[in-house]
């Protein structure tokens, strides 16, 4: 079971990683003239999103619901967050690769292709949704009914057995 002190530490780490992601999304274009620094920021951002994915799955594995074998229930409750996080991660990596390929050799010119602009907009929209749903999921996983046997869990278990 996730104790309160551990939960607050994990939640703080998740919010720190989300804050870094927001920071890089907000200010990375200002570093267009220095592609090496921009590349390092992008790599750390992708690793931060990957760490957030790992942390959320570790929180899933730690629940009583998961340990009782109701993985489908967890997946059903948090399906949107899981899918959105995967889409955001893929969009972020795609954007970072495309930006670095276009700007690496010629960082002094301002290069924005139509496809890059579309990808940029979709990645930023996905970032907003990712932050909202991820934070909501992280807070919802702090609910005690996920970590102990309850009438709600027994009802869900009986529905699965039918």
Curated annotation (Swiss-Prot):
InterPro entries cross-referenced by the UniProt entry: TM_138
GO BP terms, alphabetized: cilium assembly
Transmembrane segments: 7-27, 41-61, 80-100, 110-130
Location in or out of the cell: Vacuole membrane; Cell projection, Cilium
Alphabetical keyword list: Cell projection, Ciliopathy, Cilium, Cilium biogenesis/degradation, Disease variant, Glycoprotein, Joubert syndrome, Membrane, Transmembrane, Transmembrane helix, Vacuole
UniProt keyword Kinase, yes or no: no
Predominant localisation class: membrane
Keyword match Calcium: no
Pfam families hit by this protein: TMEM138 (PF14935)
Gene Ontology, cellular component aspect: cilium; microtubule cytoskeleton; vacuolar membrane
Annotated membrane topology: Multi-pass membrane protein
Glycosylated residue positions: 6
Family under the similarity heading: Belongs to the TMEM138 family.
Additional detail: TMEM138 and TMEM216 genes are adjacent and are aligned in a head-to-tail configuration. They share some cis regulatory region and display coordinated expression. Genes were joined by chromosomal rearrangement at the amphiboan to reptile evolutionary transition around 340 million years ago.
Role played: Required for ciliogenesis.
PANTHER family documented for this protein: TRANSMEMBRANE PROTEIN 138
Linked pathology: Joubert syndrome 16: An autosomal recessive disorder characterized by oculomotor apraxia, variable coloboma, and rare kidney involvement. Neuroradiologically, it is characterized by an abnormally large interpeduncular fossa, giving the appearance of a molar tooth on transaxial slices (molar tooth sign). Additional variable features include retinal dystrophy and polydactyly.
Name of the protein in its database record: Transmembrane protein 138
Organism: Homo sapiens
Gene expressing this chain: TMEM138
């Amino acid at each position: 079971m996730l104790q309160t002190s551990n939960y607050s530490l994990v939640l703080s780490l998740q919010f720190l990683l989300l804050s870094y992601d927001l920071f890089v999304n907000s200010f990375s274009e200002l570093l267009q003239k220095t592609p090496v620094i921009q590349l390092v920021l992008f790599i750390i951002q992708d690793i931060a999103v990957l760490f957030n994915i790992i942390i959320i799955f570790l929180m899933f594995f730690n629940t009583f619901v998961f340990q009782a074998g109701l993985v489908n229930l967890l997946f059903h409750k948090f399906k949107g967050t899981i899918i959105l996080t995967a889409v955001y991660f893929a969009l972020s990596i795609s954007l970072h690769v495309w930006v670095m390929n276009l700007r690496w050799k010629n960082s002094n010119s301002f290069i924005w292709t139509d496809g890059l602009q579309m990808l940029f907009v979709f990645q930023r929209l996905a970032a907003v949704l990712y932050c909202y749903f991820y934070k909501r999921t992280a807070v919802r996983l702090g609910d005690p009914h996920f970590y102990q046997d309850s009438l709600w869990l027994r009802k869900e278990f009986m529905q699965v057995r039918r």
